[in-house]
A protein has these predicted regions:
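Short, low-complexity N-terminal intrinsically disordered segments enriched in polar/charged residues
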Residues: 1-28, 133-142
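A solvent-exposed, acidic/Ser-Thr-rich amphipathic alpha-helical stretch
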Residues: 5, 24-27, 31-75
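A beta-strand edge to alpha-helix "cap/lid" segment located at domain peripheries
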Residues: 2-3, 55-142
């Protein structure tokens, strides 16, 4: 199996862990000194902290969808485009599009992952003319 295919399989494994709420190898997937940056500011250092976050978050929410749209590979990096939807224990629903920028080490472990989010509820503020009309609702956190 080629390197790109192996990386894609590992990304699918990571997304499946969240969908199934089951750790099937976080400490093997991420390096001991991995850095994981969420799109809304939290940053985790080390595979142990990433596992702690995964275990704790899974008690507060359920990911309903994390669909992969496409991958881009260059050298030791992969970018994956995805669509995400989760429901928190309090009933709050979050749904957005995103990208993950991933760097791999020589052993095909993730050593860096940074997420970028984009509100899926987009609009054109200039649809009615040259003066922008913005929505009254609060935008998502990213």
């Amino acid at each position: 199996m080629g390197t790109e295919r192996q990386r894609e399989n590992k990304i699918r494994q990571w997304f499946s862990m969240w969908l199934d709420k089951q750790d099937t190898g976080i400490e093997e997937l991420f390096t001991p000194d991995a850095v994981y940056i969420e799109s809304w500011e939290p940053e985790y250092h080390g595979n142990g902290k990433i596992k702690l976050w995964f275990d704790e978050w899974s008690t507060r929410g359920t990911i309903e969808r994390w669909d992969i749209r496409q991958y881009f590979h260059k050298g030791d990096q992969t970018v994956v485009e995805w669509a995400f939807r989760c429901v928190m224990a309090d009933g709050t629903v979050q749904s957005f599009d995103g990208l993950s920028l991933i760097r791999w080490n020589e052993a095909s472990q993730i050593c860096f992952l940074q997420e970028f989010g984009c509100n899926e509820n987009r609009y054109d503020p200039y649809a009615q003319g040259n003066t922008p009309v913005f929505r009254e609702e609060q935008a998502l956190w990213f």
